[in-house]
């Protein structure tokens, strides 16, 4: 977060920081992120802590260590009070953090079972890149998560444009990226630094969620939105991509802030992180930074790997210079 603000300031030619919107909110605090069993938490235990206020063991979602029954989340409490509820993420909708708000599983990798729990809640809006393990690995002919949507009253929209068409008549909504985008990478929507025209964004998701949930404000709504790829960029130690993701997340918060500006007395926005990833450090023993050089990076680590793999495929995995490859392509 601080690195992003310093990076923004450097791009503007200023010393210090260029503040993000959410760092200027009136209240801030800190949290201790250890799980019930590990000094270093994972997203499942951390998500459960955020959703329920209870610490559990790593890998567990919505259940406590060695205990039954499962524990419910703030999203369930809101639904039980008559509020409309939405759960949204930039990664798969049955991933650890979103799952912690609606599912109960001893292992975060039980993606199919977590996805089935999604439909048991009756929440009004879900969004993410897609499902992981949409069919049961042990019985692929039953319990298809896409087919379960219609059976449980959910309308599936594929992409923001499709949402605009489908949402007016939908009672409950499941927004996923286009099938074409999922063929390229289903586990998440593209990084901000890799984004192409037509890609679904976290802003699209958040705008859709607020639009859908605010159809009826008589009892209010609860919405959880996760910028899930910030974590992944940090896992890759990819500073430039991380900064782009945080700026993109800040732009997403601006959409929520617009709603707050229209409903200031009824709206609470909480921005938090579940844990740190990657050991991000500013400085390596010197007294200066030069973050602005990162503006020259135009693709994420994932995107770069994809480009290299495509080049290898074109050259039958033979080592050739990029200049030679381009010349060959031009001649052919």
Describe the residue ranges of each PLM region.
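Metal-dependent active-site segment of extracytoplasmic phospho-/sulfohydrolases and closely related
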Residues: 3, 250-290
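Active-site regions of oxyanion-processing enzymes, predominantly non-cytosolic
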Residues: 159, 163-177, 205-227
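Surface-exposed loop and adjacent secondary-structure segments within mature catalytic domains
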Residues: 6-65, 75-76, 80-200, 280, ...
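Histidine-centered active-site microenvironments of extracellular/periplasmic hydrolases
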Residues: 275-318
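Alpha/propeptide regions of enzymes that mature by internal proteolysis
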Residues: 57-63, 243, 247, 257-259
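Active-site His/acidic residue clusters
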Residues: 96-102, 180-194, 217-220, 224-252
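Beta-strand elements within well-structured catalytic alpha/beta cores of enzymes
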Residues: 1-2, 78, 176, 220-228, ...
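Single conserved hydrophobic/aromatic residue that forms the stacking wall/gate
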Residues: 324-327, 331
């Amino acid at each position: 977060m601080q690195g992003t603000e310093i990076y923004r300031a450097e791009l503007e030619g200023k010393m210090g920081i260029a503040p993000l919107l959410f760092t200027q909110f009136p209240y801030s605090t800190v949290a201790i992120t250890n799980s019930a069993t590990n000094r270093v938490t994972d997203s499942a235990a951390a998500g459960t802590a955020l959703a329920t206020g209870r610490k559990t063991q790593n890998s567990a979602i919505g259940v406590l260590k060695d205990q039954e029954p499962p524990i419910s989340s703030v999203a369930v409490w809101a639904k039980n009070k008559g509020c409309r509820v939405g759960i949204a993420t930039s990664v798969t909708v049955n991933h650890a953090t979103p799952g912690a708000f609606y599912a109960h599983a001893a292992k975060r990798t039980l993606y199919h079972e977590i996805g089935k729990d999604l439909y048991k809640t009756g929440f009004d809006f879900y969004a993410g890149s897609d499902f992981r393990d949409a069919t049961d690995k042990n019985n692929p002919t039953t319990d298809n998560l896409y087919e379960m949507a219609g059976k449980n009253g959910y309308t599936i929209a594929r992409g923001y444009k499709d949402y605009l068409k489908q949402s007016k008549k939908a009672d409950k909504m499941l927004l996923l990226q286009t099938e074409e985008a999922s063929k390229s990478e289903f586990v998440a929507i593209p990084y901000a630094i890799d984004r192409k025209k037509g890609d679904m964004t976290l802003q699209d998701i958040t705008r859709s969620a607020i639009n859908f949930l605010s159809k009826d404000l008589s009892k209010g709504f609860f919405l959880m939105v996760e910028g899930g790829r910030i974590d992944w960029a940090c896992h890759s130690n990819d500073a430039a991509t991380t900064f782009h993701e945080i700026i993109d997340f800040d732009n997403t918060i601006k959409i929520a802030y617009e709603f707050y500006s229209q409903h200031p007395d009824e709206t609470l926005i909480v921005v938090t992180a579940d844990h740190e990833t990657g050991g991000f450090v500013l400085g390596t023993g010197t007294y200066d930074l030069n973050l602005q050089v990162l503006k020259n990076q135009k693709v994420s680590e994932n995107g770069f790997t994809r480009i290299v793999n495509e080049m290898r495929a074109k050259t039958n995995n033979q080592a050739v210079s990029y200049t030679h490859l381009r010349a060959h392509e031009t001649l052919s």
